[in-house]
C-alpha cells in the first residue's frame, strides 16, 4: 500500500552556488560517509550532489516528515543495484524509524537534464 510520494527538482546552478559558498562543508552536510568516499571519483560532481540532494528531499516528502530527526541527509544514502537502478540505503537510526512507522520500502527514480535534476520517491507500508 502506498504511504506517500515525494518529488524534488533541483537546479544545477543552485548546487554550484552552494558548493562555491560552503565548499566541502556542503558535501559533508548532504552526503553519507559512504557517499563522501565516492564523491571525489564522480565524473560530474555537481550532478552527483544535486541528484543526492533531490533524492533525499523526495524521500523526506514521501515519508511525510521533511528533513528532521532520523530523516536526515546523513542518514539517507543513495546507491544502485546490480542493474544500475537507484535505490535508498539507510543508517541504523533511520532503519529503526522506518520500521516503527511501518514503512517497508521507499522506491526511487531520478532523471537529469542539462541544468536540472528530478527525483521521485514512493514510500510503501
Curated annotation (Swiss-Prot):
Its EC number is 2.7.8.7. InterPro entries: 4-PPantetheinyl_Trfase_dom, 4-PPantetheinyl_Trfase_dom_sf, ACPS, Ppantetheine-prot_Trfase_dom. Keywords: Cytoplasm, Fatty acid biosynthesis, Fatty acid metabolism, Lipid biosynthesis, Lipid metabolism, Magnesium, Metal-binding, Transferase. It catalyses: apo-[ACP] + CoA = holo-[ACP] + adenosine 3',5'-bisphosphate + H(+). Its main location: cytoplasm. It comes from the Bacteria. GO terms for biological process: fatty acid biosynthetic process. Mg(2+) binds at residues 8, 57. The keyword DNA damage does not apply. GO terms for molecular function: holo-[acyl-carrier-protein] synthase activity; magnesium ion binding. The keyword Transferase applies. Transfers the 4'-phosphopantetheine moiety from coenzyme A to a Ser of acyl-carrier-protein. This is Holo-[acyl-carrier-protein] synthase. It comes from Neisseria meningitidis serogroup A / serotype 4A (strain DSM 15465 / Z2491).
Amino acid at each position: 500500500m502506498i504511504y506517500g510520494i515525494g518529488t524534488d527538482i533541483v537546479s544545477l546552478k543552485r548546487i554550484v552556488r552552494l558548493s562555491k559558498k560552503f565548499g566541502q562543508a556542503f558535501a559533508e552536510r548532504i552526503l553519507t560517509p559512504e557517499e563522501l568516499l565516492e564523491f571525489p571519483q564522480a565524473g560530474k560532481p555537481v550532478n552527483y550532489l544535486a541528484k543526492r540532494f533531490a533524492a533525499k528531499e523526495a524521500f523526506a516528502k514521501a515519508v511525510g516528515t521533511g528533513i528532521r530527526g532520523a530523516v536526515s541527509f546523513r542518514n539517507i544514502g543513495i546507491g544502485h543495484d546490480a542493474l544500475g537502478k537507484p535505490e535508498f540505503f539507510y543508517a541504523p537510526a533511520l532503519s529503526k524509524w522506518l520500521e516503527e512507522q511501518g514503512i517497508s520500502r521507499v522506491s526511487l527514480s531520478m532523471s537529469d537534464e542539462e541544468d536540472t535534476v528530478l527525483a521521485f520517491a514512493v514510500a510503501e507500508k
